[in-house]
């Protein structure tokens, strides 16, 4: 049985004059426990995903890794 993620909210992340959209999803992993995911598409085919036990933790993790991720992509 497939259970789809539920979009909880979206936020904008600003970095060096560019805006990136961060989508926060909840995925029911088990009966009592849910997994939260933050997803940001940097370009077609280049998506960054972070997870956490809460929406806030997933968002915080994504906001922490995005600057490094964006900078590393600019080096390629």
PLM features: residue spans?
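Mixed-charge, Lys/Arg-enriched low-complexity segments
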Residues: 43-76
């Amino acid at each position: 049985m497939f259970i789809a993620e539920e979009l909880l909210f979206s936020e904008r992340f600003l970095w060096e004059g560019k805006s990136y959209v961060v989508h926060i999803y909840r995925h029911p992993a088990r009966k009592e426990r849910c997994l939260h995911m933050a997803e940001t598409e940097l370009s077609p085919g280049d998506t960054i995903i972070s997870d956490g036990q809460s929406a806030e933790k997933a968002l915080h993790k994504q906001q922490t890794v995005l600057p490094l991720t964006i900078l590393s992509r600019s080096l390629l």
